[in-house]
Amino acid sequence: MLMYAGRGIPIVMPPEDCDSLADWLTAEYPDEFCASISFEPDFVDALCAAGFIPMATSDGGEGEYLIPKLHTIRSVMEPRDVAVTRTARRLSSRYSFGLDARFDEVLDACVATHGEDWLRPPLREAWLELFATRRDRRCRFASMELCRGDYLAAGEIGVFAGSCYTSLTGFRRESGSGTVQLAAAGRYLEASGVALWDLGMPLDYKGVLGAHNVSRPEFLSLFRAAREAASARLEPPAGAAAFPARDLLDRLI
């Protein structure tokens, strides 16, 4: 059921047909956010499967709200188009690139970097539950980890829906490590058969990476096509816990 808060924000609650919600917002609503008091993992999973980015906010007191976002303009690209700079290639020899080994650490590092403004505790709890149960979900939450030895230098949290991967939040701790992590992520997604890399809100660095901007209707069309296609999970070589980042960038994997 769709209702309105005092400021004209749509209020949504599970069960909700999230594809129909996305269509309604596209046709009738010029802004980007809905709101809900529900952080149920099933609901967050359904929102991700419809192309929303799950965010959260607080009213300054005890009230916590899920604020699903469906951007009016979205930054997207095909992973094969990721720009790999000379600097990224040179620095990549220092690092390994892994997946799903340190989800909790990556999430904590994102909060330490960006604060709790939208990464509210109930949202993080939902993400942790969705990661723990990812094999039983429509969408698969994941962490990407760029490490120098055991040191976690950069990483991100994202979610797979079919052959679409959406980057949700990330961090870096060393100069240049974020550039290497994004380049390695692009190469990993390409090798895994991901057709659409959704980078969310347009920012300058995403354009440098190779992304372009699309309207909300264009995004939903691209997202739904990719969602219905399968992507493979590329695993590290036998006996290894991660990929050499340089090998990913050089397309040796």
Give each language-model segment a name.
Residues M1-I253:
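N-acyltransferase acceptor-side catalytic subdomain
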